[in-house]
């Protein structure tokens, strides 16, 4: 039995849960709903409240589903959409490297999400 997909799901899902709860509740030093709405306004993503809630809920719920190995392809698809939006609206103009705020990190997350969606969640999952 391989534990690598469980580890990948737990780490990636946990990171997304953390980022989502930063947006929704201000946990872990995050901006909370008002700060996230302001960020969406600066990015010209309207309606900003809807965009902020959608991003936070997708990251939180998608991260939870991914960590549990439940509806893994759907969770990975939703989270990939969030990362593609982050690349397009925030990171692309900064080039590839993370040191300049580039798209390196979200791109790695997308690759990991697509790998999990394709290979499945593994034996230790609720999908099995």
Protein language model annotation of sequence segments:
Residues 1-27, 41, 49-57, 68-128:
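Extended, low-polarity transmembrane helix blocks
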Residues 26-44:
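Membrane-interface interhelical connector segments
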Residues 63:
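Conformational-control "hinges and anchors"
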